[in-house]
């Protein structure tokens, strides 16, 4: 086998892997956003979060994460936004798993919707953690500085 051909095949496989990771991260981040919105709906319905204008801030946070996921996919800024947005999603799960206002706090424990609420928290924790891992891997694999040759050649 020609050494040049094997290098090209290896580079193509590496590029395919990078595209698969980007697709996985995009999918996991979109699922995290979806589960966070479902969760926020439950929080409002179960009176664990206030209904009102404060939710405009929540909408803004979701829009920023959506922007980072879709429009900044594969870029450092997108990975950073996804990392912190997913950390918020994981934090939501952790907060609800502990304390007096946790999973069975408020009106949730006596509701027929308790299963969906708890399932959403578990799924949110899974997708958020997966998004954190993938975005951290992507950030660590990027070069942090451009070489002077690359910037002066342009």
Task: Specify the residue positions occupied by each region the protein language model found.
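Loop-to-transmembrane helix junctions at the membrane interface
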Residues: 69-94
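Loop-to-helix transition at the N-terminal end of transmembrane alpha-helices
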Residues: 48-63
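Cytosolic juxtamembrane helix at the C-terminal end of the final transmembrane segment
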Residues: 133-153
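A cytosolic-side transmembrane-helix exit/cap motif
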Residues: 72-75, 98-111
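Alpha-helical transmembrane segments in multipass membrane proteins, preferentially the mid-helix core
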Residues: 62-72, 134-135
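Individual transmembrane alpha-helices with interfacial aromatic-anchor signatures
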Residues: 110-128
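C-terminal TM-helix exit segments that contain a strictly Trp-centered aromatic cap at the helix terminus
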Residues: 36-46, 87-103
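Cytosolic juxtamembrane helix and N-cap/initiation of the first transmembrane helix
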Residues: 7-32, 137-140
